[in-house]
């Protein structure tokens, strides 16, 4: 619940301003400390001062906004009680930049022992793995990334049981997710199990939320959280050459910005599957025995259409889009495919390459 480093630059979140123009009938805006349930999800909102606010929307969606008048705040939606075996998916907008002291994280508490834990997906100016006086416990692989683990101690600080002395556990994603449009999956069992091998045990779960946090900074977020990864969705078609009980299960996690965008999964010289995207980040699954270079190709760019591909997985092994250097559809350096790739985005007809399978 606590961040320790000061920042003071200002950002303008265009996406947040646009979101404010669309009102939701069920919206409830919080400006004072509160916990409860909303549309089937638990929520928490806490601040120690200032103008931070959080708006509860349908399902697992919430929006937040804060400025430098707020010393420290944290809020989000999720579940109470939490679970060590939960798989969490999230998507939306994280409106900060590298000068702002903020986290986007799976955040929760346990009792007996009293533990505050974070799985940090993205952060701004301050890396929590550098917390003063902490102990490093190595790293492990999960959900297509490396997570660095650190334990810190908080002495006589706010907790779910008032001011207490307790440990914090951090898993910090490397590479961290970017800013702006964002999505991902957190397999929390991988974190809880690794922590336990290092003697970092959790207790009885209290709440567990996908949280935004800020400290003496300015920003906004618009986040939707759900349990597990969705599958199917949209319209799909598979080529005959990809059917017949192939040996590889490939999942493409993607969405369109307008809906109706078309993507094709290619392996070698085979069109394995073609899907028509919705605006919801969705897992699209295909089975194939084809081998060779793999790519996801965007084929019907027009108007305000863009495609965001979070990752592909091959038999459960995730390959993140932002780790790939082959991307001919992202708009960089003034042209489509004009940069070094390493992006989830296809702004133009083009493809992201994911290597041989």
Swiss-Prot record:
Q: Where's it found, cell-wise?
A: Secreted
SUPFAM superfamilies xref list: Concanavalin A-like lectins/glucanases
Q: Which domain of life is it from?
A: Bacteria
**Has keyword Hydrolase?**
yes
User: What pathway is this protein a component of?
Assistant: Glycan degradation; xylan degradation
- One cellular component (GO) term of this entry: extracellular region
Keyword list (alphabetical) reads: Carbohydrate metabolism, Glycosidase, Hydrolase, Polysaccharide degradation, Secreted, Signal, Xylan degradation
Q: What class of enzyme is it?
A: hydrolase
Stored Gene3D superfamilies: 2.60.120.180, 2.60.60.40
**InterPro entries, sorted:** CBM60_xylan-bd (IPR031768), ConA-like_dom_sf (IPR013320), GH11/12 (IPR013319), GH11_AS_1 (IPR018208), GH11_dom (IPR033123), Glyco_hydro_11 (IPR001137)
Q: What does induction of this protein depend on? A: Induced when the bacterium is cultured on xylan or beta-glucan but not on medium containing mannan. Is repressed by glucose. Transcription of xyn11B occurs later than transcription of xyn11A. Is expressed at maximum level in mid-log phase, and its transcription persists into the late exponential and early stationary phases.
- Under which EC number(s) is this enzyme classified? 3.2.1.8
Any one of the GO BP annotations: xylan catabolic process
- GH11 domain span: 29-226
The UniProt entry's sequence similarity note says: Belongs to the glycosyl hydrolase 11 (cellulase G) family.
* General function of this protein: Endo-acting xylanase which specifically cleaves internal linkages on the xylan backbone, releasing xylooligosaccharides. Is able to hydrolyze glucuronoxylan and the arabinoxylan from wheat.
State the protein's name: Endo-1,4-beta-xylanase Xyn11B
Organism, by scientific name, is Cellvibrio japonicus (Pseudomonas fluorescens subsp. cellulosa)
Name the encoding gene, please. xyn11B
């Amino acid at each position: 619940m606590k961040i320790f480093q000061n920042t003071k630059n200002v950002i303008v979140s265009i996406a947040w301003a646009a979101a404010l123009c669309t009102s939701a009938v069920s919206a409830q805006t919080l400006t004072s400390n509160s916990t409860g349930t909303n549309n089937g999800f638990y929520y928490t909102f806490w601040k120690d001062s200032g103008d931070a606010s959080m708006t509860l929307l349908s399902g697992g969606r919430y929006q937040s906004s804060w400025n430098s008048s707020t010393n420290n705040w944290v809020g989000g939606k999720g579940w109470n009680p939490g679970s060590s075996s939960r798989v969490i998916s999230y998507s939306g907008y994280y409106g900060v930049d590298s000068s702002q002291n903020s986290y986007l994280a799976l955040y929760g508490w346990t009792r007996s022992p009293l533990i505050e834990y974070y799985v940090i997906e993205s952060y701004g100016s301050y890396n929590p793995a550098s917390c003063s006086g902490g102990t490093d416990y190595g790293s492990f692989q999960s959900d297509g990334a490396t997570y660095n683990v650190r334990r810190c101690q908080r002495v006589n600080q706010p907790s779910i049981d008032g001011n207490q002395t307790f440990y914090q556990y951090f898993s910090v994603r490397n590479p961290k997710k970017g800013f702006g449009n964002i999505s991902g999956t957190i397999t929390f069992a991988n974190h809880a199990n690794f922590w336990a091998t290092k003697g970092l045990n959790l207790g009885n779960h209290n709440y567990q939320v996908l949280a935004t946090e800020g400290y003496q900074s300015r920003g906004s977020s618009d986040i939707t959280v759900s349990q597990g990864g969705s599958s199917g969705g949209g319209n799909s078609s598979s080529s005959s050459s990809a059917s017949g009980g192939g040996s590889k299960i490939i999942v493409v996690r993607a969405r369109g910005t307008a809906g109706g965008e078309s993507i094709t999964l290619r392996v070698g010289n085979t069109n394995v599957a073609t899907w028509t995207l919705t605006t919801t980040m969705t897992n699209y699954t295909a089975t194939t025995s084809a081998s060779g270079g793999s790519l996801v190709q965007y084929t019907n760019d027009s108007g305000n259409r863009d495609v965001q591909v979070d990752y592909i997985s091959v038999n459960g092994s995730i390959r993140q889009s932002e780790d790939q250097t082959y991307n001919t559809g992202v708009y960089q350096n003034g042209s489509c495919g004009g940069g070094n790739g390493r992006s989830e985005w296809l702004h133009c007809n083009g493809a992201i390459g994911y290597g041989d399978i």
